[in-house]
Amino acid sequence: IVGKEGAFKKVMENLFKIGSAGTAIELRTVLTKKNALDLPELANFISKHLGFINKWVIMAMEPIGFAKANKDELFYDHSIARFPLHNALDIASLNGVNVQLYNFPLCTVDKKYRKYCTKSISDWKNKYIDECSTCEKQNSCCGFFEWYTQDWKWLNIKPIN
């Protein structure tokens, strides 16, 4: 994804060095249109080769900077195209990988997978949109980034009641 020759090899070498030193590793993957369909394969890879990591975090994209400027190429609506994400969570979980979801509003993930969601957006950059006003899960939901706008909207947002 970074498009740099040798980047994967370098990352793997450094992960193994850090892991062998006993350092806690939180591996983060930002969900994008470019990697969404490969997420189950990545879950298999992490399960087989990176068992020493402490946590694998899959993050919904924050609508700022490069992501915002390249929305059409990067934004992936996991609320309607759920299979890759859910499949990856199943694979990771079945293989003992501690996996969590950051920046995923609870209503955008099937009920079975909400246990992976974390209230991950800092208070100072967090907001709840109109659809959240009647949601019973608002207190345990990460909500949305302050700069989240209607043109960056997941299609399947609805209150959980």
Language-model-derived ranges and their functions:
Residues 10, 39, 68, 100, ...:
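Short linear functional motifs in flexible/disordered or boundary regions
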Residues 24, 36-38, 55, 61-133, ...:
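A C-terminal junction/extension of Radical SAM enzymes
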Residues 7-9, 45-48, 75-78, 118-122, ...:
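Short, low-complexity, polar/charged sequence segments that are solvent-exposed and flexible
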Residues 1-59:
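Radical SAM/AdoMet-radical enzyme domain recognition
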Residues 13, 42, 71, 103, ...:
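Residue-level detector of alpha-helical recognition elements and their boundaries
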Residues 125-161:
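Radical SAM enzyme core and accessory elements
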